[in-house]
């Protein structure tokens, strides 16, 4: 089964909508930021502080690659995932990608 991948700016509703969709269709819900926190045993802000953005993006890309091999998931991505073309290619291999657009006041 293909994944459903949700992208968009911070606070665009990726997690909220992702959880609702996953429950409705019986898919597993995965938030990439939570996945990274569980894998590294560190908060995202802590990774940035200790190692910098470049290292965080490496970890993020590695996690995206892992998640792209799993099927039957609704995946809510961090806002920066779309900045890396390889991340998007990996997500598209086994998923349909949606961009959630919101108004600035949302």
Per-region residue spans from a language model:
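Conserved phosphate-donor/acceptor-positioning beta-strand/loop module used by diverse small-molecule
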Residues: 91-106
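ATP-dependent small-molecule kinase phosphotransfer cores
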Residues: 32-92
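Walker A/P-loop
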Residues: 15
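Hydrophobic anchor at the beta1->P-loop junction of P-loop NTPases
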Residues: 6
